[in-house]
């Protein structure tokens, strides 16, 4: 755990209130239960468009559970139920009649551990496109190239698209998973500790990529690494025991937290 606050490289300035900006997503009074375990307790958060929001907090605080709730991934877990609203484009997607396939197309997700398909590099990106009905080979190839370029991977793999994705390094596999997600042209990307299993060089590439991707997508990232949150995010939400303790601009939260629990956590006094 850090013993000092993460350094903020920019001059402290007031970040616009997230509620004053156009919202890509929001939750209102969101609760998540695993059986009798009340994992998320009435969370209200708003995620501004084309910004990066980091979710931080100690292990077991609920941040990954909350992230998975945003595109209904928790529906795959037996005994899990959710109450409250998950608003995407102003529509509550926490309803039984919602098409989850389309939800996850619009709200893409990249997991902590790279999980490429046991297919070629090309097929990893093209698979979802074909499944959604794209048939023109030229159009598919154009989308594959565009997605790999956006994931800063094209120059490294353009001559090896037929090779197995499993032959790539861990960092390359994670960028391939990001390319696979952006190929579906989502509006929101959910990143669950995308660099935690990577070496420092690969981590740096992922962070640079996040800063590029926010020009096209709204990004919500879970991270245990507070230095990383400080480097890549515009807004930060501190979770503790399934609740949001504080949510503000990243520079404000790390340099002038308003809650003692936040101050204690970023100073390394607990968590």
Curated annotation (Swiss-Prot):
Instruction: Cite the SMART domains for this sequence.
Output: AAA (SM00382)
Please give the function described in this protein's UniProt entry. Answer: Part of the ABC transporter complex PstSACB involved in phosphate import. Responsible for energy coupling to the transport system.
**Entry EC no(s):** 7.3.2.1
Cited Pfam families: ABC_tran
Under catalytic activity, the entry for this protein gives:
phosphate(out) + ATP + H2O = ADP + 2 phosphate(in) + H(+)
CDD domains per the UniProt record, alphabetical:
ABC_PstB_phosphate_transporter (cd03260)
The ABC transporter domain sits at: 25-266
| Cell membrane found in the keyword field | yes
The protein's name is: Phosphate import ATP-binding protein PstB 2
Assembly: The complex is composed of two ATP-binding proteins (PstB), two transmembrane proteins (PstC and PstA) and a solute-binding protein (PstS).
Q: Where in the cell is it found?
A: Cell membrane
Region annotated Disordered sits at: 1-20
UniProt xrefs under InterPro entries:
AAA+_ATPase, ABC_transporter-like_ATP-bd, ABC_transporter-like_CS, P-loop_NTPase, PstB-like
Annotated ATP binding sites:
57-64
- Please state the gene responsible for encoding this protein: pstB2
Give a yes or no for keyword Cytoplasm in this entry: no
GO cellular component terms?
Answer: plasma membrane
Q: What is its main location?
A: membrane
Q: Keyword annotations for this protein?
A: ATP-binding, Cell membrane, Membrane, Nucleotide-binding, Phosphate transport, Translocase, Transport
Q: What is the membrane topology listed in the Swiss-Prot or TrEMBL record?
A: Peripheral membrane protein
